[in-house]
């Protein structure tokens, strides 16, 4: 859950469908205050538990710097991959069978391909 419209709407719909979702938040420590307030408001309003993973800033900053130096267009690939992994980690930890994601639909499907190896390669070549 990011606190933006897409993930907030997904929580609302999941509750409407009679599901008992767990909101999972990947905190890269760059949250806008409105996002933090929205997460609290949505989870409280719909009675949804929240599980948050906070990044190790030293590692995350090293990776982000490498992406800046690489000049690649997938600047947030590291965050996207980390978010997917955090959702899978939460699902395993709490024995959750299904993962629901809300997306804005802004990025065209198939416009990017990246995986953990891509992030690791950029980090190895360009990080401190």
Q: Residue spans of the language-model regions?
A:
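ATP-dependent adenylation/nucleotidyltransferase module used to activate substrates
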Residues: 1-128
